[in-house]
């Protein structure tokens, strides 16, 4: 509700420890494709359906920072990552091995060794690996979301604490090939307030409430700027498919 979207051509990522990617629908979708892709239907405000998927989020970088005894802030890790070469590794960030490893850095390094890829070593390389692969993951799931809902998504709203990460926002715009609008960071609290105001006639409806949210907070827009990103997403999808086949052997 705290997401300042309008119309039907937008999706959202609630970006925190975990990422919730989805769209606001009028009716639920309970198809085999939705089941296979692990999307769920949740009741939303005013009879809407939040069609979404819970995927990996900032947990990865939180654990990377913890494993370095918080020597670097999240902003410093992002700055270091921005200076590194992009897309040096492909990682399935939704693999169960990243849910609660003893050491997140070592888990990423082990994954890269096992898959025959360059192993990230420095704090910047590790952070870049995390951010690149989160963005690639978002791109794959946005494709799934569009295929299942039949909607063409032109804008992706990123809300929550993760919306403050400018590097990840730009990487997401590039990988997803859509406009990304980031903010507000406190969308959960704002949404709670907005629903109460709609219920007490502070706003006439949800659409007017969302217009007020848009007018009340600084939002940052990111446009796709990497012409090679879509080819990289396709390579990433091939990598995931190959890893899935190997897991079945």
What residues fall within each predicted segment?
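Active-site core segments that coordinate phosphate-bearing ligands/cofactors
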Residues: 1-155, 164-188, 194-249
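Glycine-rich Rossmann-fold phosphate-binding loop(s) that bind the pyrophosphate
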Residues: 161
